[in-house]
């Protein structure tokens, strides 16, 4: 009994001590972050074939699957009056080989439950690891022996034209066309626009010439991830890919864009719009691996990288102008862009632009708080850590390191670089990459409701959906003193007056539609007794 009492006393003392320690913690302050740890990044192996093809292998035996991506590292291309032929050539790669028709190729891929896709710079294949050899053999056949027949070319062209037609009234597609053309210029690979006319001018020979010029092993890389062994992969690629012949590929050089001289408004009138698509930005030069990237990434999280950003909290949470407002930036060996964007109601378009400009200026001239910086860093580090759970991330790191000549420990030191970003760094990159007086404000919306109030932000220029300059749309305005009743009465007088309307006893409507599968048009007639208007 005495022992029990002593135990109770010791327990009470321990609890009191723990409570006292707990009570001393000031929970109004964020705990100090520990030093950034070096991430545990998975390993990869690399080998190179005699033809120059470089292959990166990430072994992961958790699941019996494998994925392969072949990347052709060519410079951007200016396609001119045949814009679209590069994309079409990439599509044709997956439409059969000289040894397999398209139907045969599709049948073999489907039988394995696999996936195969092609583009103008890549071939991707994935499936069960027991089919690894078959997938390598098919990938090799596609990249070395594309058929590119006239029949498949005609089909691809028809589908391409159909897609362009569907994008003509899509506000997002219109914005991509116009913003890109005005930021980079139409005589730049990133600014030219694919149209019906450019696609119609493409020939099968154009697509073949593209393939023959750029699909070369000495400028290509392959990443393989999954349940495979390096020794097996080496054997398969030597067997199936060694026949791919190397050749010299000419590089391209393009001048930097200089199209934006001062902040201005570019407006595309879309009369059916009930909301405006807004994009505000400027070109930037930021190559992969640049020392500014980490600070800029922290800055972008604070400004508009998500729901914690200034733009989101201002335009959505505070003003309720939109469901979300964000910002983003890109990296590119040539040139890229920074921009902020949202979709807002017509009635608040000018107010939204004002808030965008306010937040961009605040980012350039103000100083981010310690709490904002800590949250942004935590978000970036958390995303990075989660990405390491995917073996494909390791393959991506390997490819980027090779493609952009990054230091071998670039990703190993990533968290340390993010942790080292300061408030001064954030302000410096904000001023460097967000233009204060050379912003392009691009809006796709209903000109009648939106355009007249935008002149205060800069000179307004009007464009069609392909970034061609147009005249300002005519805005109908109600003459002073005219009411809705005046308009209705004017219409009634124009058709004969109240006496004529009163004599109408019935009316009918006839509607006709043609539908696939019906032997004849569908006709509907509706007759109604006229209402007593007076």
Language-model segment annotations:
Residues 2-11, 512:
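Bacterial N-terminal signal peptides that target proteins for export
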Residues 4-8, 23-26, 48, 53-56, ...:
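Charge-rich, well-structured scaffold segments of protease-associated domains
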Residues 10-20:
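Bacterial N-terminal signal peptides
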Residues 28-64:
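N- or domain-start disorder-to-order transition segments that initiate the globular core
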Residues 58-62, 69-71, 249-308:
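His/Glu-based metal-binding/catalytic segments typifying zinc-dependent metallopeptidases
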Residues 67-129, 189-193, 305-321, 513:
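M16/MPP (pitrilysin/insulinase) zinc-metallopeptidase core fold and M16-derived inactive scaffolds
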Residues 486-489, 493-534:
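N-terminal mature ectodomain segment of secretory-pathway/periplasmic proteins
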